Design a protein with these regions (language model features):
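Basic helix-extension-helix modules of the SAP/HeH family
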Residues: 1-76
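Charge-enriched amphipathic alpha-helical scaffolds
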Residues: 9-10, 53-62, 127-157, 242-278
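Positively charged, polyanion-binding regions of nucleic-acid-associated proteins
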Residues: 20-21, 94-116
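Charged low-complexity interaction tracts in eukaryotic proteins
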Residues: 25-29, 71-84, 96, 139-186
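A short acidic, leucine-rich amphipathic alpha-helix
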Residues: 38, 119-124
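Short capping segments at the starts of secondary-structure elements
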Residues: 44-49, 110-118, 220-225, 240
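C-terminal helical accessory/scaffold domains
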Residues: 143, 158, 163-244
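Short hydrophobic short-linear motifs embedded
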Residues: 304-314
Length: 315
């Protein structure tokens, strides 16, 4: 070791000390919230960022932290062992399940916008193959809050889970989810894709929309609106829109405000409308507009078939 400098020596010791046995011993000392923080810290390390959390960990060779603001610790996993940790988590039954459960929660929040604890139970039963009681769901959400309530893409309100991008009034929440029929993707892979697809459209559609907006935004508009921020606002609005007419009205108001070119009412028909029709919509609980209309037609047809024909009954 005499020929190694301090940095190289440290890397050598860390990578040789962090074995599967060492990780087993370390994880065995964690409570449930710390295990979740460990899983999320691993994800943050892939983004080259520390995890802000109020949870404290005893000194070890995997999780390092220093004090941040407002009582938070900035916790990170060194690059030298991040791959080792990621592989360990994916091979560890409990940690792997925590990772999937958290990913499903984020994905469901992006897909539905607003949903009940009961729907989260169903998501876990179908895609995690695990049954949770409502009390289990409450405890799970509390554990996430212990890690860091600010890092989530959702918030909990009166027994409901709402995306932080949701723009409904809180007093409308329970009315909105009453008798809701939620879209359930065919595969685990599909629902997990919505963890990244926050607007409910694929990357190709989002790029197409961004290109359209860049061509139609007035560069010298008085509101100093830019493509990135404006696209986020419009796409979020579209997830709340009951019909495409509502989208048209918003685009027209942006024209009147001098933000978009006048031609958008024509070009949007070929670009924005098809995107809206295929968008996973919060108004329709994750269904697209077309899917939900088909669902309503099917329900109406079934109700008509269930009506008793009194004349036939008497016969």
């Amino acid at each position: 070791y005499s020929n190694l400098n301090k940095d190289t020596l440290l890397i050598h010791f860390i990578t040789n000390l962090v074995t599967e046995d060492y990780l087993d011993e370390m994880v065995a000392t964690f409570n449930k919230a710390q295990k979740l923080a460990f899983v999320i810290a691993s994800q943050f390390s892939a983004w080259q960022a520390p995890l802000p959390t109020r949870l404290h960990f005893e000194n070890n060779f995997v999780l390092f932290h220093f004090s941040g603001e407002d009582g938070y610790y900035l916790t990170w996993i060194p690059d030298e062992v991040s791959n080792i940790v990621e592989k360990y988590i994916d091979s560890h039954t409990e940690l792997k399940q925590l990772k999937l459960a958290y990913a499903l929660l984020e994905a469901a929040s992006n897909l539905y916008g607003l949903y009940s604890f009961t729907q989260l139970q169903r998501v876990y039963e179908v895609y995690l193959n695990k049954s949770y009681s409502l009390l289990d769901i409450q405890k799970w959400l509390k554990q996430i809050e212990l890690v860091n309530p600010e890092m989530t893409n959702f918030r909990v309100f009166n027994g409901l889970i709402a995306s932080k991008g949701l723009e409904f009034e809180e007093d409308e929440y329970h009315y909105f989810v009453k008798d809701a029929k939620y879209y359930m993707p065919d595969t685990t892979q599909e629902i997990l894709s919505y963890q990244e697809l926050i607007y409910g459209i694929d990357d190709e559609a989002e790029i197409k929309f961004m290109n359209w907006l860049e061509q139609n935004i007035l560069k010298d508009n008085h509101f100093e609106a830019e493509v990135t921020s404006l696209s986020s606002e419009i796409l979020t609005m579209m997830k709340h829109a009951m019909t495409y007419d509502m989208v048209q009205d918003v685009l027209q108001s942006l024209v009147q405000d001098g933000i978009l070119r006048k031609r958008v009412e024509f070009t949007a028909e070929n670009v924005v409308k098809p995107i809206y029709m295929k968008m996973r919509n919060w108004i329709y609980h994750g269904y697209t507009f077309e899917e939900y209309m088909d669902l309503m037609d099917k329900d109406e047809h079934e109700q008509r078939n269930n009506v008793i024909d009194l004349k036939q009954y008497r016969k």
